[in-house]
Amino acid sequence: GSIRQPAAFCGVIGLKPTYSRVSRYGLIAYASSFDQIGPIANNIEDIALVLEVIAGKDRNDSTSSSLEVPDYSKLNFNKSSKKIAYISECINHKGLDPEIKQNFLLKINELKNQGFLVEPISFPLLDYLVATYYVLSTAEASSNLARFDGINYGYRESNVKDLNEAYILSRNTGFGEEVKRRIMLGTFVLSSGYHDAYFTKAQKIRRKIKNMVEEIFRSFD
């Protein structure tokens, strides 16, 4: 499942590491270019300790990074030298709950009082994030989840008459409604005539989003 949103909903801390920092060995792949393992804990100190343990090269995952794992639990920094950015479009979004907005602004003031430099930034591609995510992730999911056919992988329905029925009933029973919807959407965006219109375009938007985020981190921590 996700890391950051569930952590936010539960009032705890969640960290989604950089892709390849933590091995994905043992994970059931949903969308390979998005899937990442990360810790959820009550405090940042525990997050650092857990990340030290789970990060690093894994011979069972060729995508895992061979870069040295820092002593995250020993990291310290001068608050006054750190610049934090927040997206102004999020604060002014019409769907934002007033109570959440109020608490968010209170947290900004709290961080400023602690010595952090906090500034608003604009992120024009904000409204494209969800659509881009769904196109790319469902496309990858339709491919990854195709292996769960009830024969080689996944749940197998026992009361079947032939191989074709085994495939149909196993996948129909083994997958939930949301998973089925995502597989169907992914199959659609990868189909002939729609691949360039949806999947290729979403890849280009993701590249623009990546470039924009990298530009932000040139000025902020």
Task: Annotate each PLM feature.
Residues 87, 121-124:
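Conserved beta-strand termini and adjacent loop/short-helix elements that scaffold enzyme active sites
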Residues 13-101, 165, 169:
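A short helix-breaking turn/cap at a secondary-structure junction
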